[in-house]
C-alpha cells in the first residue's frame, strides 16, 4: 500500500491524480482478504468498471488472475457485498451487477478470466507471433475455429491486449490492429481500446477491414492484424472495397494475421465464402501448425 501511495508523487503516473483536490478514493477492507483474494477482487473491479458508461479510463495496465487459493470459494459473495456497498455511495458509477454483465463491453472485455482452453490458445498465439516477428516472417496466418459461444471474441481481445502489455513492459514498438466488419462490434472494441488507453498511446488500433486495407501498404506491413468474425470478410468488391478477397489483402499488409472463424455463421450472412477458398486458408494454417480449435461451450 505504501508503494502504491508513493507512486502518487510521480507526476507521470496515474496515481498522481490521487493528490488532486477533487480526487475521491474508496478504501475497501475485509477480514478474509489475503493477497490472492485481493488481486482477484481488483481484477473484477477493473473488469466491471470498464463496462460502466461513466468510466472513461481504467488506468491499471493489466489484470493478474489468481488460480486456487483459500478462501477462493468466498470470492463471489465477498465481491457482491463490496459492490452493493459501493452502489450505496454512487448508483450511477456502480450499476447493478446484472446490468454490468448484460453490457456488450463486459462480454467482449479482455479482462475476463480465461478458461484453460482459452489460456492455452492465447499462449500459443503469442508464442507463434513472437517467433514470426523475431524471424521477420510475413503473411503468417493463425486460424482459430470455434462455434458461437466458445469464447472467440474474448480470446481475440485478450490476446490483442496482452501483446500490447508485453510490448509496453519490454519497451518495444508494436503495430497491432483489431479488425471487424460489424458496426456494433467495432464500436464496442473502440470503447474498450479507449478505456484501456490504447487509442491515446497508439492511435486508431481498431478499424474495419476495408479501412485497414486502404490505409496500409504491402511494402510496410504492420506486425499483427486480429480479425474477429472472419465470416464477415468480403470475397468480392462491394461498396468502398474494390478488391477480390479481404483476408488475402489483410495478410499482404500484416506479418501475422489471426482470424476467428465460425463456419456455421456463413449460412446466415450475405457474404458467401466458397468452400475451397476457406479450406485453402485453413490448410495453410494447419501446415504451419497454426490451427487452433475451441470446443468448450461457455454459454
Regions found by a protein language model. Give the residues of each.
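Short, conserved catalytic or adaptor-binding loops enriched in Gly and charged residues
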Residues: 15-22, 199, 280-287
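Boundary/linker segments flanking structured domains
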Residues: 3-127
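Walker A (P-loop) ATP-phosphate-binding motif of ABC ATPase nucleotide-binding domains
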Residues: 141
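Short glycine-rich substrate-engagement loop in P-loop NTPases that contacts/grips substrate
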Residues: 190-216
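A short acidic, often aromatic-flanked loop/helix-cap motif at beta-alpha or helix-coil junctions
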Residues: 32-37, 211-215, 296-299
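Conserved helicase motor core of SF1/SF2 NTP-dependent helicases
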Residues: 112-115, 122, 126-135, 145-150, ...
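Catalytic micro-motifs at enzyme active sites that drive phosphoryl/nucleotidyl and oxygen chemistry
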Residues: 14-17, 213-214, 247
Amino acid at each position: 500500500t505504501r508503494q502504491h501511495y508513493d507512486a502518487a508523487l510521480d507526476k507521470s503516473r496515474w496515481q498522481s491524480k490521487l493528490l488532486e483536490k477533487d480526487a475521491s478514493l474508496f478504501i475497501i477492507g475485509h477480514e478474509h482478504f489475503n493477497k490472492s483474494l485481493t488481486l482477484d477482487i481488483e481484477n473484477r473491479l477493473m473488469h466491471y468498471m470498464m463496462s460502466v458508461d461513466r468510466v472513461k479510463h481504467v488506468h491499471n495496465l493489466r489484470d493478474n488472475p489468481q488460480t486456487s487459493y483459500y478462501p477462493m470459494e468466498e470470492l463471489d459473495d465477498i465481491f457482491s457485498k463490496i459492490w452493493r456497498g459501493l452502489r450505496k455511495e454512487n448508483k450511477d458509477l456502480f450499476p447493478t451487477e446484472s446490468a454490468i454483465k448484460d453490457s456488450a463491453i463486459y462480454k467482449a472485455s479482455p479482462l475476463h478470466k480465461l478458461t484453460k482452453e482459452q489460456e492455452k490458445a492465447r499462449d500459443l498465439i503469442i508464442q507463434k507471433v513472437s517467433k514470426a516477428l523475431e524471424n521477420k516472417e510475413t503473411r503468417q496466418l493463425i486460424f482459430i475455429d470455434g462455434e458461437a459461444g466458445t469464447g472467440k471474441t474474448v480470446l481475440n481481445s485478450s490476446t490483442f491486449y496482452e501483446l500490447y502489455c508485453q510490448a509496453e513492459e519490454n519497451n518495444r514498438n508494436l503495430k497491432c490492429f483489431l479488425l471487424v466488419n460489424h458496426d456494433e462490434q467495432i464500436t464496442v472494441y473502440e470503447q474498450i481500446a479507449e478505456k484501456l488507453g490504447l487509442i491515446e498511446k497508439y492511435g486508431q488500433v481498431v478499424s474495419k477491414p476495408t479501412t485497414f486495407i486502404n490505409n496500409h501498404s504491402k511494402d510496410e506491413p504492420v506486425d499483427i492484424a486480429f480479425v474477429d468474425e472472419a465470416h464477415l470478410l468480403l470475397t468480392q468488391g462491394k461498396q468502398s472495397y474494390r478488391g477480390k478477397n479481404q483476408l488475402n489483402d489483410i495478410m499482404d499488409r500484416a506479418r501475422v494475421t489471426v482470424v476467428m472463424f465460425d463456419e456455421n455463421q456463413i449460412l446466415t450472412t450475405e457474404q458467401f465464402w466458397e468452400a475451397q477458398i476457406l479450406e485453402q486458408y485453413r490448410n495453410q494454417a494447419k501446415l504451419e501448425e497454426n490451427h487452433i480449435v475451441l470446443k468448450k461451450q461457455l454459454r
